[in-house]
Structures are given as C-alpha cells and as structure tokens.
C-alpha cells in the first residue's frame, strides 16, 4: 500500500468516526445497528489478521476539516499514524469491551458481559500476584544457602550463597556475648566453612555498616582475603577497623559499588538497592543467578520521611517483583511488632522539648553508627546555642568519616574537646557519647562511675539514652542507669516517648516487602527462632504457600531451584571469642576454664612426696579460691592432706616411680574428694614432685 492510500484510508476512517458520533447524538437506532455490525466485522478482521508494527514513515493524521497540504507533505518527514485513535474509531480497544445487550428487557445478557469483565480482571490480578511463570521453570540450576550467623540469635550476621562453581559471602558481623563469658567482649562467626570453599568464593558482599554486619571483617581478613564490595560508608568504616588491626594493605580488596548498577561477581549478577535503616547508605541486594533471582533485604524499614530525604527504593524492588523472584530473604528482627515502625524524623520534636527544658548539661548516648540520630541531636544543640563535645572513640571516628564523605554537614566551630567542657556554663554544653549498651569501658559508664578523666555526672545533668538494650545487654544497661540515678541526674530512657525508634520493619512493612517482591520461596532471616517463625506467619497471610517457606538455623544448608526448596545438609557452625581490648581471638578452652573457675572455684596443690616412705613432705602447700571462707581454709587443707597420705600409702611402685601417673593419680583423688564435699568440680591446679 502506498503512503497516499494510507493517508486516504485514515481520512475516511476519521470522517466515518465523526459521522458515527453525530448519528449517536441524534439517537438514530438504525445507525447504532450498523455501528454494532461494523464492530463485529472489525473484530473478525482483527482476529484473522496478524498484528503488525506501524511503519515509521507514516504521515501524521490531520483533522478531517483541514485540507491536505500536499506541498508540505512532499518535503517533510512522514510521521507515525495514530493507531490508538484508529482503534478507538473502530470501536476496538485492548482492555475494553463494548456492551452489546443494550436494549434487552432483563439484565441476563448484560450481567453475562459484566461477568466476563470480572473474570478477565481476576486473571490479570492472579498473574500480577504470581509472576513466577516469567521465571525459567525448566532450569535445572539451583543455589545453596548456608547461614553462618544471624539465625537463632540477634547479630553476628553472615551467609554464604553458592553454586557448584562460585560463592559469595553476605556480611561478616559480630554479636555480643551472653553473661558468663568472662573476658569475652565480642563473638564472631566460625570461619571453618569458608576455609573449605575458599577457592570458589568470589567476594564478600556488604549490605550496610552496622557492627552486626561488618564487625567480623578484620578477623576474617586475618585468615582469608577476598574482594570486598560495599557502598562508600560501609567501606569507610571497615577501612577504619582495618587500620586499628594493622590491615591497611588489605584496602586493595575494596570495591566501591553504585546503587541501581548491577555488577558481576563470580557467577552472580548483584545490584545494591537503597533501603532505609538506622544507618546511612544501607542496601538490599538483588542477586541474579541461573536458577532465578534472589532478593536479600538486609536490615530494613520503610521510612517515607527519612532525615536525608532518601526513602527506600520501592520502585526498584517492585521492578524485580514484576519480573519474577525465586527467593526472598527478609529481616525478621521486628516481626512481633504490629503496625509500622516510626520514621527516624519523628524523634525531632521530643529532642526539641528536652533541650528546651534542660537546665544543665545535656548528655546524649546512642549507637555510634546511628549517624542520623547523632546528626539530629547535634542540630538541636546548635539551635539552643550549646557547644558540642563528641566523646568516645567509635562515636568520633564514625562522625568524622560521615562528615569527610559528605553525608552530613556541621559547622566545625560548634565543637569542643572533652577537656574544654569545664570552661563553659552547664547550660551551654551538649555531650554526645557512647555507652548506650552499658559497656564498662564506654565513656558514659566512666562518667557515671567518676572514672572519666575530664567529666563526671552532676545532679543537674539531663542524660538521654536514645537506644534500646540489645538482648543480653539488659543487666549492663540497668547498672549504668543505677549509677546515673544515684548521681541525681535526670535520665530520659524508655519511659520517654519518641526518643528512640527502631531501624527494623514491623509487620505492615514486612507485608509491603512481601507484596512488592511476590517471591515463590521465602527464607526469613535475622533473628531468633521465634522471630523467623512469626515472620513466616506474616508471609503466609500475604499469599506465600507454607510449603514454600523454610525456617533456617545457623549451619543449615538449604538448596533452592525454580521448582523446589529443601534442606540438604548441616555444616559446623558456631562462635569464636574475641577480647576486643587486644583485638585477639580467645581459644575456646580458655573460655571454658574461666566458666569453670567462676562457677566452681579453684583448688591449687603443690605436693612434695617421699617415694621411699610413701608420705607427704611438710613443704607441700594447698590453697583454694571460691570454695570456702578463710576460717574454713585450714580445715579443708587438713582433709585433703589426710586423704592424700592414705592414697600414697596404698599406691604401688609403678605409680610412685612414674611422675605423670603419680600426678594424675593425685589429681583424680582431689577432684573426687572436692566433688563429694561440695557437689562441684572446681578447677584443679596440681603439681607433684617426688624424691
């Protein structure tokens, strides 16, 4: 067909459409019948003809009352015909159905036509909710998920995702020890499995810069080194840790990533997606594999009014959801909390009120990584003409890095050093410090116990603890509160509304994530078993089949493919102990010995034996710690001495002439004697010298 024929056909179509509109307004029934007949003919014609693309050289449609400008058409580029208008004119539009039963007496035919519309919309809705058909369901590929930390506990997050030839490690975090692990400051995951698969690990993938996600990185790099991918703040804080550990040379492994820019890491294609949390520059991960797409939310909340005005990238999450997601791994920390988590910006009015009413110094303690929280309180300090002293190594370091990288902007002239605080009136000072978890070496703890070199708590101080105690730290936080209250300071803690908000999604935000991603399979992560179990119920309420959900524990290995999810094994997992003051790992046996000493005490014996007489010498010494008081010490010593003398008299020459056998023989006797008396097994230090 020539261009002119196209042009004329289009003009006739427009004239026909114009006439049909006039006839409809006139109410001519004959014309309506012809229109209905023409609609059916066009529908039949369209059904028989294959769809085709509109040629790019078609002329632009003109108004039917305008005369064609043949000279202009001859010398200007031809434009695409308005096919949408032609479809409307031909009474045939995709997604729209004409009502044919217009003049029937009843409503049977009319309702049948409406019901077809209901069925069509239901089909669209079902396809929208279940986009898994877009996945390659015939793929035989699969991935294996192995959590090494972060399940069955709060913190210590680390996970391996692997194929037969490639693997990535998501995060490397630390956790706090429970009470009773004496001399242990932090716990880190056991890296044994990483040593087993080290040859196929393509990189470490960091979601955000909280300690429970990056705290183990320097300890890992002391054993194994891999490319480390993260956003600028994450790498900045990890780099600072590496400096403290003497690992500066390993910065060469750092890879700065950009959000919304997928990159290849081994056999995986990974995209960092911006999400809101209680630290700047947090990310979810979209991980494309041959088996299908995996979304890992990291720690998240859905904050529509964050301090930096950078909300969660819901559009990008929905993009992957529409394409079809095989597996979702989502944060379960706040799964028991109904509703939504308040925005970080909602704490501003509470801070304003507290500053307005404060008569003396304001001392605020929070997590050093919560830079937006620190930023907000400093802004109010500036508003109320207070000088700001930032005290605590991690707080100073994190704030300096955030300022240097341009995440926050604060006037340098507003800041003073700790030794300058006494130079200013109390009502002109704001102290921002560490210690919200009751850490005994923190600045707040030392202020409360008069151990800080420059600052002690005063009766007129207002102390704001803008944090919630991490499970396991409740007793430590309570101890600090007691010290502060004894000093007659006013303390703003949990009973004050809106001075702390969580960084984790509550149930309604978890539901929104599930609805956006629409995963085929679901693995709730981050939390104790009760947290992931509650998250499972939320997922079921959002349409994820129960059979498609698995509740993992550290060490479980779960294999996932387009058509299945199953547990395939268990590997060795656990914790390594760290003395954070020396940055050194502590052997498990040492921790066990400390537990033994703390629970049952110590008995020490230095024994001198005359082999020929089979008797104890008077130079033998005995002492105990944590078993009896000083008054009973001599009585206990006499009991043990008497028993040993009888033991030696009954010992044969083989034992007496073998130093090792004699020492073991003596140790076992003391152990049994002490258990019989105290029903405990104290730690026994025993040295035997036979002459």
Regions found by a protein language model. Name each.
Residues 100-205, 210-424, 442-456, 475-477:
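His/Asp/Glu-rich metal-coordinating catalytic cores
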Residues 145-147, 254-256, 327-329, 463, ...:
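Conserved beta-strand scaffold positions in the cores of enzyme catalytic domains, especially
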Residues 146, 162, 271, 432-433, ...:
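Residues in well-ordered beta-strands of folded domains
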Residues 242, 539, 674:
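Conserved hydrophobic residues forming the short capping helix/wall of the S-adenosyl-L-methionine
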Residues 267, 282-284, 602-604, 684-686:
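Broad gene-expression machinery/nucleic-acid interaction feature
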Residues 336-466, 470-656, 663-664, 668:
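Hard-cation-handling environments
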